[in-house]
C-alpha cells in the first residue's frame, strides 16, 4: 500500500477527528500536532502484524464546513 488518506474534521471544541477512507482506522487529537502523532500511532498499531502492508505515506485531508449568512 503506497498511501492512506484520512478525512479530518474539526470538532466544536476545537479538537480534530481523523477517519481513514480505506481502512477501519479512526483517531482524534486536541491539537493538529497531537492529531498527526495519533494518526501515525494508529496506523502503526493497525498494521503491527503486517509490516509489509504499512503505507509509504499518510495524507491528511482537512474538511471544513462553514455557513455564511446571506443577509
Question: Would you name each region that the model predicts?
Answer:
Residues 14-50:
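Amphipathic, hydrophobic secondary-structure cores in small proteins
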